[in-house]
Amino acid sequence: MDDNKRPLYLPFAGPAILEAPLINKGSAFSEEERIFFNLEGLVPYAIETIEEQASRAYDQFRSFNNDLDKHIYLRNIQDTNETLFYRLVQNNISEMMPIIYTPTVGLACERFSKNYRRNRGLFISYPNKDRIDDILNNSTRQKVKIIVVTDGERILGLGDQGIGGMGIPIGKLSLYTSCGGISPAYTLPITLDVGTDNPQLLEDPMYMGWRHPRIGGEEYAEFIEAFMQAVHVRWPDTLIQFEDFAQKNAMPILERYKDRYCCFNDDIQGTAAVAVGSLLAACKAAGTELNQQRIAFLGAGSAGCGIAEAIVAQMVSEGISDEQARTQVCMVDRWGLLLDNMPNLLPFQQKLAQKCTNIQNWSNFSDNISLLDVVNNTKPTVLIGVSGVPGLFTEEIIRAMHSHCARPIIFPLSNPTSRVEATPKDILHWTSGQALVATGSPFEPVVVDGETFEIAQCNNSFIFPGIGLGVLASGARHVSDAMLMASSRALAECSPLAIDGSGPLLPKLEDIHAVSKHIAFAVGKVAVEQGLTLPMSDEILQQSIEGNFWSPEYRRYKRTSF
């Protein structure tokens, strides 16, 4: 218990305290608190520390035989005692992050209605579109500073999960707290229930969402607009993170609101920021610069194109022209290499399509130019996978890349693990241990010729908690492209491999607090420089970061009245 902080004064007592996860301490209530708050007999006699509670909880966690059961167990602790939950997760971050988020959260989303136990967050359904203000006022969280919102249409690589997508905002906000020190009292997960086009859910008698095909067009746009306006009225200074919206909606929503409200899309911008940060670290480890790379993407959706645009921006900042940078980035999707004469390119794909004149001298390529064709003709030094289709980085492709690049940089980023384009084990064996690898999901270390390679997880959790902390600490009114670029550079500065030539490409999760604070400072500093917040010195910004960083410690309670 942190006795150095002033006590919290509570106006209620008895079972109500034990039912409030933000303030419940379970067996850690002191003797005085048990008397004053009418808790005697409601908890066992022994008074425990939070570490003793966490030790018991960890033993119980280890007793479960599969990851989904472990996920459900941890969520139950979160819904009864949030301070204990975050102490347990922080004590075992490497072991538990894959359980509370990817890859296990995908299965939890698929089984959300079947495994539903207790309410968390808000479900705003389309039939209630005229009562959004009332629904927001129903939240048990009154000082919301960060919202993660989804409509459940593109959950990881699993597609439309309807309200089951709520597992993603819950998981993401758990990482904001456990990695970025954001108080759970300031977080709110929201699912916009606009129906589902998943026939299995519509026919499932246990499905708990609105049984209706997804709305679209003007109805959808008006619903999103009503939601954004209502949130801004209720919590005008909150940061809104868009999560797992379908490709057709993700970019238009971001473009519509990024200059009106403090918001960002983690799938597009967060993924891009962590990918660029990892790429900068890999380039430094390989002894080269990003603007010298030739980059091939497999996957040209909003996430892939978001990464590509961030790479182009970083290349330009390193001194080459925008036009030149775009010639060094090739986007391949299911129809092959994106070319400027293709009739059905999406708006965000058009600027990344290669000019047909650029491939006139290519040799031995098919009608739909494949990834192998791109590798053989452009000789890329970087290969990034965001396709969501497993096994597409074949041995032939990887060996062809390695034949012209001594230290290829290969990032199979698709989630969950079952969707990865190639496993690190295969990539490292096909390149004799020379590839610099980062993945979107966690993988065990790989041994090649007696050397052990730790696999960096190019996970957004290295970026978005620091961005959120930086926005809160600085009071930024928007999330600018420059702030995101600063987060990438700050992450690269934390790379063990880039710093001393050994260790993993990205920091260990055990160092995530220091990484998040470093990123928060870089993000907040740019916000100050761009006039997106009030002027403040570096010293004041750093103090604000430390002051906003929450730790899972119990507080002393006093009763306001009897």
Swiss-Prot record:
Swiss-Prot/TrEMBL cofactor(s): Mg(2+); Mn(2+)
Gene Ontology molecular-function annotations: malate dehydrogenase (decarboxylating) (NAD+) activity; metal ion binding; NAD binding; oxaloacetate decarboxylase activity
EC id: 1.1.1.38
Positions bound to a divalent metal cation: E243, D244, D267
Binding-site positions, NAD(+): R154, D267, N415
Any one of the GO BP annotations: malate metabolic process
Feature type site, description Important for activity: D267
Active site, UniProt feature: Y101, K172
Catalytic reaction annotation: (S)-malate + NAD(+) = pyruvate + CO2 + NADH; oxaloacetate + H(+) = pyruvate + CO2
CDD domains per UniProt: NAD_bind_1_malic_enz
Details of cofactor binding: Divalent metal cations. Prefers magnesium or manganese.
UniProt xrefs under Gene3D superfamilies: Malic enzyme, N-terminal domain, NAD(P)-binding Rossmann-like Domain
Cellular-component GO terms for this entry: cytosol
Protein family: Belongs to the malic enzymes family.
Quaternary context: Homotetramer.
Stored NCBIfam families: PRK13529.1
The protein's name: NAD-dependent malic enzyme
Record organism: Shewanella baltica (strain OS185)
